[in-house]
Amino acid sequence: MNPSLIRKLEGLIERHEEVQAMLGEPDVAADQDRYRALTREYAQLEDIVHAFQQFRQAEENLDATRQMLEEDDADLREMAQEELPLAKATFEEQEQALQVMLLPRDPKDDNNCYLEIRAGAGGDEAAIFAGDLFRMYSRYAERQGWRVSIVSCNDGEHGGYKEVIAKVEGEHVYGRLKFESGGHRVQRVPETESQGRVHTSACTVAVLPEVPEAEQIEINPSELKIDTFRASGAGGQHVNKTDSAIRITHLPTGLVVECQDERSQHKNRAKAMSVLSARLQAAEDERHRAAEQSTRRNLVGSGDRSERIRTYNYPQGRLSEHRINLTLYRLGEIMEGDLDCVISPMIQEYQADQLASLAESN
């Protein structure tokens, strides 16, 4: 392993001991916010310390096996020859696992996020597919113990959504969903198709990390146009009584955000401002990425409709993830929320790219 990584690990072990001592101090225990923050840090460091111990054990085992190859005893040499492949494989596995844990973490990975799904080419069928995608993500969120709440939606004429924006809250939400941004294409026979022909439709998905209030981009109130209107859709008689829905237009960029989820105009405005802040921050982050002109693949999509990332082929029960050449014939399970079989390989590929970049820089 690279000496600089070993030094970094030794520093983390020292920090682990330091945090452990701090957690036993009365003044830390009295400060709940500080105590919770240190507890989280300790848990993360504990995993790294444990992984480092396993790495050292594998390293010692490999060294001992290699030394046995130099023994005079023929039986010992033969035994070492048999054990060497497993010892090397275990060492390499532990080394890679440890390196992955040391990769720079995106601080936004632990944030909640906004999930935006828009119907593209394909008319009614695209709107129906947008509804299917929203259901898929909702089922996945349920499996993860996350909470999903709709911020705004525009229903399709024959089901589904022309557009739906939802907030997803829970642990490590953005870190799991950030690879979903981009163009999603579906190939299937619509229910209204009498000839049995396969149609192709498309939707775009954008996943935006929620920006904590303290980090939000400062928005000049004079650059906002705020309209109120009556909410539509489910909600009983109340929806026709008050202009509780909010539409905010950010004049410099032309970004428009609507929210009609809450009965309170004040709450709708707060939600809309939060979505607007997330979109402005995402646009700023995209500008930074473009300025860096990175030669590495960017597996975290931008939500651009021209960036087709995935195809859902219903006649073949096939899902194709184009960014990593992954093909799975379990579309039914995936549409029911079993998304880890797609998301986990994406994360692994992303980490492999990061490791390659780290090796180049060292």
UniProtKB/Swiss-Prot annotation:
What compartments host this protein?
Answer: Cytoplasm
Pfam families attached here? PCRF, RF-1
Q: Gene3D superfamilies per the record? A: 3.30.160.20, 3.30.70.1660, 6.10.140.1950
According to the UniProt record, one GO cellular component term is: cytoplasm
Full protein name: Peptide chain release factor 1
UniProt similarity note: Belongs to the prokaryotic/mitochondrial release factor family.
Q: How is it modified after translation?
A: Methylated by PrmC. Methylation increases the termination efficiency of RF1.
Which Gene Ontology molecular function entries are recorded, alphabetically? Answer: translation release factor activity, codon specific
The record's annotation in PROSITE patterns points to:
RF_PROK_I (PS00745)
What lineage is on file?
Answer: Bacteria, Pseudomonadati, Pseudomonadota, Gammaproteobacteria, Aeromonadales
Which species? Aeromonas hydrophila subsp. hydrophila (strain ATCC 7966 / DSM 30187 / BCRC 13018 / CCUG 14551 / JCM 1027 / KCTC 2358 / NCIMB 9240 / NCTC 8049)
Q: Enumerate the UniProt keywords alphabetically.
A: Cytoplasm, Methylation, Protein biosynthesis
Q: Identify the main location.
A: cytoplasm
Q: Does the keyword Aminoacyl-tRNA synthetase apply?
A: no
Gene designation: prfA
Q: Does the keyword Lyase apply?
A: no
